[in-house]
């Protein structure tokens, strides 16, 4: 996420942020966009299950899609990570970014790296496996004996 990405949803968010902070130079950042996405997903899940019961909301989150601030949508995956576009930018003189490359579509978030020895055999799947660190070799959820 870059504040300098131009579209209506991002422009509206930045305007509200500047009004809230009473500082037109205050910048936004990726963790702020993540909060916007996460809260919108939580609201949608609460509305779906008509409850704020944490277990019901958690079960309703996978598959939830909401707009992101870069002009597309983000989706909650069974591993409780989301899809997002990836941007590479170069810094401008004002500290903002020019986008020099972006993914053609959304990139799925992954809970575990396939490249690290300690995590390459782990899988997160809260829908089917009900586990965030399932070992595909031992067929056990982390923490269980």
Where are these regions (language model features)?
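Extracytosolic ligand-binding ectodomains
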Residues: 1-145
């Amino acid at each position: 996420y870059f504040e300098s990405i131009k579209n209506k949803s991002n422009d509206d968010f930045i305007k509200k942020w500047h009004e809230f902070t009473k500082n037109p130079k205050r910048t936004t950042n990726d963790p702020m966009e993540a909060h916007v996405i996460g809260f919108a997903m939580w609201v949608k899940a609460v509305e779906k299950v008509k409850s704020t019961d944490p277990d019901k909301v958690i079960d309703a989150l996978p598959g939830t899609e909401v707009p992101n601030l870069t002009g597309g949508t983000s989706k909650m995956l069974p591993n409780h990570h989301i899809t997002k576009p990836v941007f590479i930018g170069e810094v401008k003189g004002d500290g903002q970014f020019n986008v020099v490359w972006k993914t053609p579509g959304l990139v799925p978030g992954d809970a575990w790296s396939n490249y690290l020895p300690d995590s390459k055999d782990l899988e997160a799947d809260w829908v089917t496996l009900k586990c965030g660190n399932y070992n595909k070799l031992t067929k056990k959820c982390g923490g269980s004996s």
